[in-house]
């Protein structure tokens, strides 16, 4: 992982646990308008206040469904898919569970043409009707032709998983499956992932504006 230091303000995304508490048992609860600080030296993955400039990258590290739009400042170290800083301010925080589930269904629909999806699976992905979710999951599990395009199948199967699963975890995993199944090579995969990020950020910004 490459890393370089900067000293500027950077807007980014940070997912929180559902109770908004920070990790490492430090007792802090995130709230909009507050600036949280740590003393250096900071180090990626080890010490400091982290966030990602792309929402799709932040999703990989999500401990829950609460999304925060943040500003990092002070000393900042940039990595490949995240940053760490000495200061992090929350501009707003929102519960993104339904937004993430909707995004997961959207991701699966982008590749549904790559496998012979049962009708009820398609209906659930298009509507988000919770009364169809259990039947859609069962139908996806019993689909006989899943080997034809396993990544597309798993993207749809994951979108229909039970509400007991974290929406953030589902969205992260199945967005990756969807991007992989739609891409013929690494460049195409990167483009598909960027398109997913654009869609996710559009939905998250709309969520923030609707608070």
Can you annotate each of these PLM segments?
Residues 1-211:
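Short, glycine-biased loop/turn motifs at secondary-structure junctions and
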């Amino acid at each position: 992982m490459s890393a370089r230091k900067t000293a500027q303000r950077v807007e980014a995304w940070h997912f929180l646990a559902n109770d908004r508490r920070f990790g490492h048992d430090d007792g802090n609860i995130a709230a909009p308008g507050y600036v949280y600080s740590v003393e250096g030296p900071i180090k990626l993955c080890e010490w400091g206040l982290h966030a990602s400039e792309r929402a799709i990258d932040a999703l990989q590290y999500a401990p829950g469904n609460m999304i925060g739009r943040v500003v990092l400042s002070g000393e900042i170290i940039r990595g490949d898919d995240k940053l760490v800083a000495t200061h992090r301010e929350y501009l707003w925080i929102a519960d993104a569970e339904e937004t993430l589930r909707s995004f997961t269904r959207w991701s699966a629909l982008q590749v549904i043409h790559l496998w012979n999806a049962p009708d009820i699976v398609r209906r659930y992905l298009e509507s988000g009707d919770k009364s169809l979710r259990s039947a859609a999951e069962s139908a996806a599990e019993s689909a006989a032709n899943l080997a034809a395009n396993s990544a597309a199948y798993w993207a749809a199967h994951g979108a229909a998983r039970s509400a007991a699963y974290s929406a953030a975890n589902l969205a992260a995993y199945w967005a990756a499956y969807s991007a992989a199944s739609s891409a013929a090579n690494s460049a195409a995969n990167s483009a598909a992932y960027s398109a997913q990020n654009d869609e996710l950020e559009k939905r998250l910004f709309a969520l923030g504006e609707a608070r």
